[in-house]
């Protein structure tokens, strides 16, 4: 009789106790359908090991184990000639994947804790926002937002500082300047003529454009990955590009440049990839929203996938409660992993090597979720 314990692995996809439970469930199924078959204990251990080798996360492991248990019941425990379990990944149904995706949807409390605007925020009365002093998000100086288009000096670092273990100090990634430096570049390696601000409260954001709750936008259940690019304008922080990708087919449903309401200060080309906006061609925000907030695209039944989606939904002025955020699914200690690092870690894929591309980012976040569930990234038929 084989020892009923999981095979040791260098990288465990799930805790020991969880793997033991799966082995016992497999054994129970085999004993039910093939009670006279020899060495069922060994087969249970072997088949669990096959599942573990295919899984890169606890959630993916549990999903793959559920498929194995389903197949044992479906095929009455019949074995192939080698006595091995061959995972039928292409046979995973759309309904099963949809159920697994729903298990990844974040609760309203988690959404609120991570900066998402929720229905509760919209219900609570907010104090009237008054125009006046704002803090520049780049140089951190106070300025009068009514003078935002008046040329001034804004000196800042393009990228945040990061701890350098070798130097044992914080260092700016954009220029290598040390955080405690007293040189002229200590305040920043770049200088522009305007301060910029970013409204963060529900009241401040609603003042420019009202939020719309997807509840009431009827439509069939769909799964969409999305990513936005933003620019700084005289009105704050606005949408300038939106990409929406369909989960099941990898089809790009929407990829448009969108006109901001305010006068453009900085398109953030280094990060947005947007070089110019032709107002004669680009859709206005309202024109774009008529398309992306609709029964055929983002509706009350949509599951939305993205990385740090609170920023995207804020500029889209959407309140939605079915969110899968890869930044929250894969925490990095007290911090959140960047999509660039996450794509390399989970997919061995390098992204954002040049200017950002919202379609590349949307697909990367979507593929991270597919990888988590053990779904082939190239599968397009269901």
Curated annotation (Swiss-Prot):
Annotated signal peptide: none
Keywords: Cytoplasm, Exonuclease, Hydrolase, Nuclease, Nucleus, rRNA processing
Main location, first listed in the record: cytoplasm
EC number: 3.1.-.-
Keyword Protease recorded: no
Places the protein is found: Cytoplasm; Nucleus
Single GO term (MF): exonuclease activity
Gene Ontology cellular component list: cytoplasm; nucleus
Limits of the Exonuclease domain: 223-369
GO BP annotations, alphabetical order: exonucleolytic trimming to generate mature 3'-end of 5.8S rRNA from tricistronic rRNA transcript (SSU-rRNA, 5.8S rRNA, LSU-rRNA); regulatory ncRNA 3'-end processing; rRNA 3'-end processing; U5 snRNA 3'-end processing
Function: 3' to 5' exoribonuclease required for proper 3' end maturation of MRP RNA and of the U5L snRNA.
Family, per entry: Belongs to the REXO1/REXO3 family.
Entry protein name: RNA exonuclease 3
């Amino acid at each position: 009789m084989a020892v009923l314990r999981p095979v040791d692995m260098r990288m465990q996809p799930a805790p020991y106790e969880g793997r033991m439970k799966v082995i016992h469930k497999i054994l129970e199924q085999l004993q039910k359908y093939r009670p006279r078959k020899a060495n069922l204990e060994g087969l249970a251990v072997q088949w669990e090991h096959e599942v573990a080798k295919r899984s890169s996360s606890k959630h993916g492991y549990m999903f793959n184990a559920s498929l194995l248990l389903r197949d044992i019941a479906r095929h009455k425990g019949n074995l192939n000639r080698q006595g091995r379990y061959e995972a039928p990944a292409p046979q995973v149904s759309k309904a099963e994947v949809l159920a697994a995706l729903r298990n990844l949807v974040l609760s309203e409390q988690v959404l609120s804790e991570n900066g998402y605007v929720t229905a509760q925020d919209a219900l609570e009365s907010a104090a009237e926002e008054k125009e006046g002093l704002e803090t520049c998000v780049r140089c951190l100086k106070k300025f009068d937002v009514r003078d935002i288009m008046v040329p001034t000096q804004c000196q800042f670092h393009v990228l945040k500082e990061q701890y350098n273990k070798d130097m044992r100090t914080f260092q700016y990634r954009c220029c290598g300047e040390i955080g405690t430096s007293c040189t002229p570049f200590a305040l920043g390696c770049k200088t522009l003529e305007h301060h910029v601000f970013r409204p963060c409260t529900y009241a401040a954001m609603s003042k420019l454009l009202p939020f719309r709750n997807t509840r009431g936008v009827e439509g069939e259940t769909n799964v969409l990955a999305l990513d936005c690019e933003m620019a700084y304008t005289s009105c704050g922080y606005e949408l300038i590009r939106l990409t929406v990708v369909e989960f099941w087919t990898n089809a790009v449903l929407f990829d448009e440049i969108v006109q901001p309401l305010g006068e453009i200060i900085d398109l953030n080309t280094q990060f947005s990839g947007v070089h110019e906006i032709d107002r004669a061609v680009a859709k206005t925000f309202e024109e774009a929203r008529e398309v992306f907030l609709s029964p055929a695209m983002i509706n009350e039944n949509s599951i939305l996938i993205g990385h740090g989606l609170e920023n995207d939904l804020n500029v889209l002025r959407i309140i939605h409660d079915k969110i899968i955020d890869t930044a929250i699914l894969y925490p990095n200690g007290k911090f959140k992993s960047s999509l660039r690092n996450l794509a390399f870690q989970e997919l061995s894929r390098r992204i954002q090597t040049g200017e950002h591309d919202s379609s590349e980012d949307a697909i990367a976040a979507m593929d991270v979720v597919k990888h988590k569930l053990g779904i082939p990234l190239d599968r397009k038929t269901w």
